[in-house]
């Protein structure tokens, strides 16, 4: 069984990944509120070992998308990262078609708070970064759902199943570090 561990660094820049990790900046097409799709950019680090670890960092979203940083966006980012890893051949084996979930699981953790940290100069793209001390963690089985294509790319979607949750929603409701990305259990 291969386990996936997705975690977010709280205070360090992911441009310098921890030792043994590989840095990725990838664009992803995601549904936006009210219909249509929006291209966002996600920074993350990957360590390929018996447990595959991913640290999600900054998220760059064009302001015209009207797309909030939210628990559902983090969920979609995690699924897209796992799908990209299967396409790249990072994952040794095949994720089973749904509803079967044997063999692969994900440990998906990330900062439960994000904050707006600026606009990329010369663009309308906003950058959001993890902040604060709390983490959101869920452990799920994985399967690929070829009958449920991604609404923006048409690719098969990864589904999370039988999830157990730990971690806390963002505790802050004031100040800049207050965007909640964690769904409470």
Positions of predicted regions on the chain:
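Bacterial N-terminal signal peptides
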Residues: 1-3
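Structured domain cores in non-transmembrane regions
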Residues: 48-104
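Extracellular Ser/Thr- and Pro-rich, acidic-biased low-complexity repeat/linker "stalks"
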Residues: 7-19, 51-52, 156, 174-175, ...
């Amino acid at each position: 069984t291969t386990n996936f561990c997705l975690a977010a660094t709280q205070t360090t820049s992911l441009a310098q990944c921890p030792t043994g990790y590989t840095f990725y900046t990838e664009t992803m097409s995601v549904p936006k509120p009210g219909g249509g799709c929006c291209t966002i950019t996600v920074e993350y680090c990957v360590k390929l070992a018996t447990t595959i670890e991913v640290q999600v960092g900054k998220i760059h979203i064009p302001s015209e998308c009207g797309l909030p940083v939210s628990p559902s966006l983090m969920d979609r980012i995690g699924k897209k990262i796992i799908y990209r890893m299967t396409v790249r051949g990072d994952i040794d084996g095949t994720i089973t078609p749904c509803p079967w979930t044997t063999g692969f699981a994900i440990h998906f953790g990330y900062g439960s708070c994000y904050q707006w940290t600026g606009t990329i100069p010369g663009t309308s793209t906003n950058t959001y970064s993890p902040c604060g001390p709390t983490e959101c963690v869920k452990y799920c089985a994985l399967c690929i759902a070829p009958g449920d294509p991604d609404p923006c790319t048409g690719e098969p979607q990864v589904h999370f199943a039988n999830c157990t949750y730990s971690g806390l929603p963002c505790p802050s409701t004031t100040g800049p570090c207050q965007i909640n990305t964690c769904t409470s259990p």
